[in-house]
Each structure stands twice: as C-alpha cells, then as structure tokens.
Amino acid sequence: MPIATINPATGETVKTFTAATDDEVDAAIARAHRRFADYRQTSFAQRARWANATADLLEAEADQAAAMMTLEMGKTLAAAKAEALKCAKGFRYYAENAEALLADEPADAAKVGASAAYGRYQPLGVILAVMPWNFPLWQAVRFAAPALMAGNVGLLKHASNVPQCALYLADVIARGGFPDGCFQTLLVSSGAVEAILRDPRVAAATLTGSEPAGQSVGAIAGNEIKPTVLELGGSDPFIVMPSADLDAAVSTAVTGRVQNNGQSCIAAKRFIVHADIYDDFVDKFVARMAALRVGDPTDPDTDVGPLATEQGRNEVAKQVEDAAAAGAVIRCGGKRLDRPGWFYPPTVITDISKDMALYTEEVFGPVASVFRAANIDEAVEIANATTFGLGSNAWTRDETEQRRFIDDIVAGQVFINGMTVSYPELPFGGVKRSGYGRELSAHGIREFCNIKTVWIA
C-alpha cells in the first residue's frame, strides 16, 4: 500500500512513496546489526563530532525543514522552524554531555570486598523507534540523539503521514557523518512493527503515540523481554489560583492549548480555575481564543493551522458535539469550518459535569475545557481525575499552594507559573496510562543502555 503525503490545509495528495518490502526491512535490520558491532567501539569524541555536524545542518536547513513539516502535517511555519532548531539543540546537548552522563559510577570497593567496583553503561544495540506525526522531527530526535551518542544504532518507523520528514531525518544524520547503517528510516505500515520488534537482532524499542499503540508495542516487547520506553497520551491540567497573575495565566493558557494546532500530548487541555476568579478568567480566555486567526499555515499571520488528519478533525468535532448534546456550554468555536482542509476553530467549553466524557478524556485539537474549583482540594481532585499523567501546570504565587501542587498532582511533570515544555536538560515522561520510562536528560540516554556491574578482586 502506498504511503502518501497529504497537505492537511487542502486535503490534496502531494506525493506518494512505495512502502518497504519484507526483504528490504530484513536487509535494513541486518545492516544495522552489522554496523553496531563496530559503531559501539567509536569514541564519544567522534560521535560528538558527527552529532554537532548534524546540528549544523539542521540549523542551516531550518527553513526548508519547516516548509516540509508544514506541508505534511499543518503546523505553522514559525512553529515548524522552531522545531527544527530545537532538534539541533538536542543533538548539541548530547554531543556535549553524553560522555559525562554515561561515565562509570564508582562504588565503595572495600564494602563489597573488591579492589575496584563500579557500574558501566553500555549500549543495547539495534533500537526500534515508533514515532508519531505531531512533532515529526523533534520526537524522533529525542530518540536518535541520545541513542546514537550512547553507541546504539536506530531504526525509525514513523507515522505514515509524515514520510518526507522521516526520510529527511535519516538523510541529515547520514550527511552529518554518522556511518551507513547507524540510523535508517523504514517506510512501513504499523502492521510491520511486530515482526521488526520480534526480530532477535533488535534489542529494544521506544514509542511515542496513542495508548492503543503503546499497549500493542508494550505487549510485544514484554513477550520478547525487551526494554521499552512508552510516551503516550496526556490530558494535562492547567490550574489557576486567585494569587496568580491572571493576564499572564490567560496568555499562557491560550498558547498552551493551541500549540501545534492543539495536537500535543503535553498541551494544556483541562483548565481548572478557582471560583473567585473563574468568571474573569473565562471572559479573558474566551476573548483571546476567539480572536485567534485560523488559516493557511504558511501565512505568517496564521495562529492556528489545520489538524493533521481528516480522522483527527472528525474525532475532535464529535467530542465537542457530544459534550454540547450532554449539556456543556460552547463559549466560542465549536463548529467545523466551511473550507477545504481539516481545520477546526479554537473552542472553549464550560459547564462540564463529571458524567461527561470530556471530564477525563484527551482532546487532540484546539479545544479547551474549563472547570470551576471551589478550593485547592477540588482543583487537585479534578486535575487527577484522568487515567493519564503526563504534564501539568499550576499558576499561583502562594508557595504553600505551589508545594501542594508539586506533591499531589499525579504526573510526570509539573510546571509552576508556566506551561509544560520539553527541554533536553529535563527528564520527560509520564505515569499512569501516559506510559513509562523517560526521554531526554541523563535519564533518557540511560534508557538506551545496560548498566553492567563490574567487580574486581
């Protein structure tokens, strides 16, 4: 079955690609497996030179990469360029820090009856990455940069609607100097993942995607006893308390909700506002959301572009329609736009009761649900009333309230007076059904290593 690039702003097919055959996939795995034998022996200094050269190319080609991303999945050009530059930063971070992050960890040898004892980090081998379309370069680089700097080799199975981004990443890594076979893109369907992951030459996997996709890959990896990192969905809370800077909170709330056209696992989705400031927040928030310009993502004046897929747009529309039918109030937006492409307007919904699906579920589009909380206890209760636990945000100047949110929100991340963002320097991941394992920081690179205990008499 062909793999197509479809412009979500028009719905038109731009380019089609032929999927890899079983023999081509087998050859790619064999090439990676052979390459690992010598690549793992390369020095950190050599890998760092290749990583920095890759970063140089990403920076030099940021405009071209941005245009490609925008064409394939609809994010605005500004957001796409920022993503390309962030990828360069990710490669540079691991180029600079990998050797220190993976240094031997000495133990007190005398206490274990040895002359020397330590833990040594060693690469796992061939790693399969199953990546989504919403951040087509950054999500893959969050895997590629640490995995390669640790001495592993990678196979990328990207979402089928972003083939050009997937091929570009393998190309830019090769042009950066990494040897042939270190990083390969496989243009295959999701149905091919199981056979690849079960192949004994593949040592581990990482997946960013939906909960069902994570369950599938997690089950296969569990059966094969292969280490896996899963970063799945999120229904992130954004709490606003009376002591917060309200205007700053509203501004950040808008950005947090519509970033990437609302299609981010760490986008703020459920806005939980203290009753004392609820009306003021809603008025300001609705006004700002309604004023956003929806349009051509290549237009620099556009704030919100199309959703990446027609199915995604239809799912968002149905979630809003179901909420309205159940009694929720649509404060702005809420209707499909009569134009080509897969656009959906910024939408704010209030009066959501606990029995509505929207109370807990994730909406992957520019739709904000706003909840009223009588006190901090109720704010925390609503924040945790979801099966997900990826990111979270809380706005308050009160240090006691800040500590409460840090301690009691069940999530992999909490941002106080800001919005959840991924940084190379900070661990990224979730709890509950948002997955397990961590990306980025020291934790992310160590996920791709075996720590070997060394004891010398």
Swiss-Prot record:
Keyword NADP on entry: yes
UniProt-recorded name of the protein: Succinate-semialdehyde dehydrogenase [NADP(+)] 1
PROSITE patterns named among the record's database cross-references: ALDEHYDE_DEHYDR_CYS
Matching Pfam families: Aldedh
Catalytic residues (positions): E231, C265
Family: Belongs to the aldehyde dehydrogenase family.
Source organism phylogeny: Bacteria, Bacillati, Actinomycetota, Actinomycetes, Mycobacteriales
Primary enzyme class: oxidoreductase
Domain of life of the source: Bacteria
EC number(s) from the headed UniProt entry: 1.2.1.79
Binding, NADP(+): W133, N134, K157, H158, A159, S160, G209, S210, L232, E362
Reaction it catalyzes: succinate semialdehyde + NADP(+) + H2O = succinate + NADPH + 2 H(+)
UniProt keyword annotation of NADP present: yes
Function: Catalyzes the NADP(+)-dependent oxidation of succinate semialdehyde to succinate. It is believed to be the main source of succinate semialdehyde dehydrogenase activity in Mycobacterium. NAD(+) can substitute for NADP(+), but enzymatic activity is three times reduced.
InterPro entries in the record: Ald_DH/histidinol_DH, Ald_DH_C, Ald_DH_CS_CYS, Ald_DH_N, Aldehyde_DH_dom, ALDH_GabD1-like, GABD/Sad-like
GO biological process terms on file: tricarboxylic acid cycle
Record key words, sorted: NADP, Oxidoreductase, Tricarboxylic acid cycle
Gene Ontology cellular-component annotations: plasma membrane
Chain segments annotated as transmembrane: none
GO molecular function, one term: succinate-semialdehyde dehydrogenase [NAD(P)+] activity
